[in-house]
Amino acid sequence: MKSRMWATAVAAAAMLAFATVANAGEPEKDGLVYHDATEFLIGGKATQATLTPYDRLPASYEKTTRPELWRHGHHSAGIYVRFRTDSPIIKARWTSYFGAYMNHMSPAGIRGLDLYVLDEGKWYFTGVGRPSRDNKTSEYVLVKNMDRKEREYMLYLSLYDGVTSLEIGVDGASVIGKPQVDSPRRGCPIVMYGTSILQGGCVSRPGMVHTSLIERALDMEVINLGFSGNALLDLDIAQLMASVETPAVYVMDNAPNCKADRIEAHSVEFFRVLRDAHPDVPVVIVEHPLYPTMRLNNVEREDIIARNNAQKAFYEKLRKAGEKRVYYVSGEKLLDEMKDGTVDGDHFTDLGVTYYVKAVLPTIKKALKASPNKVGK
């Protein structure tokens, strides 16, 4: 009886909180009421102690970590905002940290937004926020002409730029508030560390980065710690990963940024930081993808083979030392045999990402079964 009364009280409090947000603010010229996204749930972060709500690295790292790594920490790759609304229209207004541009990636992927809706337990793409070409501040209608019905939404943030402010606009008669459904399930995230590829280079929009595809496939929060050109086995990143309270699985996918000698010199020490903090959490080690350009580029072919040999030796060293909860994904599996999955021979297109997910997901699922930290446990 007491537990039923407590559940009723919690539900009533949740409804009250939901209604309270609904009446805040006055409509602007476009007829919409804008809400600061920090009023809702922000997911996909290893820590909340950041300079801005949408940074990935702790504020304490500003003076201690490498400048290049710190800069990429401002990029909001993998971070999402979860909210619920019955508005027939949803618009976003956001300001980018850098106003970044790259000549081999979609602007929507670099500094746009990506909206998904939860329908019958599955997440579906709903609309993309296209960034302004000339200004750091952008406004875009993500979806419109819907029936007035309460729905759960997830808004993925920019992959290769940061977000300094974000507002969600809904019509004046609507309610909007924090989500009432725990999806992706939080509490025991998968923590993935890697390179520009893991950060999202070079998918068409934020929801297509492979950490987000894995997140939706498993209905589990995934933390994206991809740092373009800077997955160099820095110990402060290992310490950040280790600080996650109840990780389900760690993934080390750093080989594309590490020469063979760096892998040999630093991998075990990086791994030990994770293992000392979480003795039983599985670690998945991923090889360097076999790029299509290896067929003709002799120097690249020899370099990648050397890196993968070093990565395999690292894995085997752990196994010989008695580590049982370590898993390995071969580079041969990461791209389709035809290799039509990159934009420039290195960075993945949406097609390449689907190959990657197909290759790594079975191993991650296997590791999850061995993990002591399970969502809902």
What are the residue ranges of the model-derived segments?
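Catalytic nucleophile-elbow at a beta strand-turn-alpha helix junction centered on a G-D-S/GDSL motif
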Residues: 187-211
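Short helix-loop-beta junction
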Residues: 211-224, 316
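Cleavable N-terminal signal peptides
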Residues: 11-12, 22
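Structural recognition of the beta-strand scaffold that forms the well-ordered cores
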Residues: 189-192, 221-225, 248-253, 282-286, ...
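Oxyanion-hole/transition-state-stabilizing segment in secreted/luminal serine hydrolases
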Residues: 202, 206, 214, 232-277, ...
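Catalytic His-Asp segment of secreted/periplasmic serine-dependent ester chemistry enzymes
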Residues: 243, 291-377
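N-terminal secretory targeting modules
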Residues: 1-6, 18-189, 366-377
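Glycine- and acidic-residue-enriched helix-capping/strand-helix junction motifs
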Residues: 102-106, 200-208, 301-305
